[in-house]
Curated annotation (Swiss-Prot):
Keywords: Cytoplasm, Nucleus, Phosphoprotein. The lineage of its organism: Eukaryota, Metazoa, Chordata, Craniata, Vertebrata. GO terms for molecular function: receptor tyrosine kinase binding; SMAD binding; transcription corepressor activity. GO terms for cellular component: CCR4-NOT complex; cytoplasm; nucleus. The gene is TOB1. Changing residue 65 to A: Impairs interaction with CNOT7 and CNOT8. This is Protein Tob1.
Amino acid sequence: MQLEIQVALNFIISYLYNKLPRRRVNIFGEELERLLKKKYEGHWYPEKPYKGSGFRCIHIGEKVDPVIEQASKESGLDIDDVRGNLPQDLSVWIDPFEVSYQIGEKGPVKVLYVDDNNENGCELDKEIKNSFNPEAQVFMPISDPASSVSSSPSPPFGHSAAVSPTFMPRSTQPLTFTTATFAATKFGSTKMKNSGRSNKVARTSPINLGLNVNDLLKQKAISSSMHSLYGLGLGSQQQPQQQQQPAQPPPPPPPPQQQQQQKTSALSPNAKEFIFPNMQGQGSSTNGMFPGDSPLNLSPLQYSNAFDVFAAYGGLNEKSFVDGLNFSLNNMQYSNQQFQPVMAN
């Protein structure tokens, strides 16, 4: 009896694995085994295998067998979840020396287990013998019941005492950790935690990105020079507005030393790096370096009241003057005129 019950149990719970909690499914199998053995006492006839077959049949459909309902209740599973994961209209016959099942009212009857020593066993072909549940990963057909060893948690019954159940029983030993092993796991999980710092990319720098520092300095010098030029254009646009205002008496001139300090402080720190290569002969031309229809609307530069940039910052041979320039100074032509200082507005 125990062998046939185990074959039927393995077939039923194979549909529940990986869909319901495994521990509860194992408890469900143990409770169902206990209830079936209790039900079949006095209704097991090895001399007449088909006697009482309808009583021993387990049916799961619109009406679920009371044994399945009781096992679900004892294991903590919802009966709707159990019925939803099992095939519709499933019937399992557990008879002496044979276990068979049928899915649907008109489905074919397939054999799960048959005793080869029985005289009717030779009539079954290989296709019927191998008609196991394809989803039963834990279901293993038992070929030789006499050679198997009983490992069932319940006591054996009768001549079918040798059985090897395939569902895992409840573990009696609790899972324990030491302080070191628990520290290496994720909190609330037995999986080892991974070091996330090793996977992070190190902070990059301009050297790691393949950029040249000299190129960055040149770009910075050019951008600052254009900023100074834009300030000069705004100053030229504000001149007509200042002319429209009524004339006011000029303030008294400051002392000469204070004038020199104001000119020095008002000079842009990047003015020494800004050079106009096409200034000669373009004092009043509007098609020169800065045409009148340009977005900046820069007027021609006025060279009155100017001072010498080279006198203030040294000659061309000094390194501080030529730093940041991206072209050769030997090919440039300079006029003898003085340069207009860049004044802050």
